[in-house]
Amino acid sequence: MKKIVIADAGPVIALARIGQLSLLPRLFGKVLLTDLVASELTDGGVFADTAVLQKAFAADWLEIIKTSDQDLLQCRDWVNLHQIDMGEASALILATTHAALGDDVLIVLDDARGRQAAQHARLKALGTAGLLILAKNAKMIVEVKPLLMALQAEHYFLSERLLKAVLQLANEK
């Protein structure tokens, strides 16, 4: 059984914005993105972090997977059913495909509806905050709180309830 990690755009953008994109390969080695997610990250140079993301695309730890025509049709169904975007749908479909092959799959996404869809599909899901806890537990970062505050400073929404729960899990105040 292979360990497969698939990421959606949200956590990749969040980590890039706070200078912690390197946590993904340090925690997981190779990370898969669908071509739809990759397009969300780079098309039009919308994000200030596009240069950082382009560098990541050139690295060997990030692998872009082309979404098949059949999967694109399935994506539209997932978009309608779960009210998620095409990138999230493509990542979830890639994850379910690998899970059906018997792989140990983790999908990294932040969107609440996307996480509900992952749960519905019986996939293991982890968000940016969970990644930061893993990184702290692996002694890759010292504290989670300053990074959560940096995310908020970058206009990344974190509910008060989530902040409290994450800080408690990280043994921080």
Model region roles, listed by residue range:
Residues 104, 115-173:
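Acidic, PIN/NYN-like endoribonuclease modules and their adjacent C-terminal/linker elements
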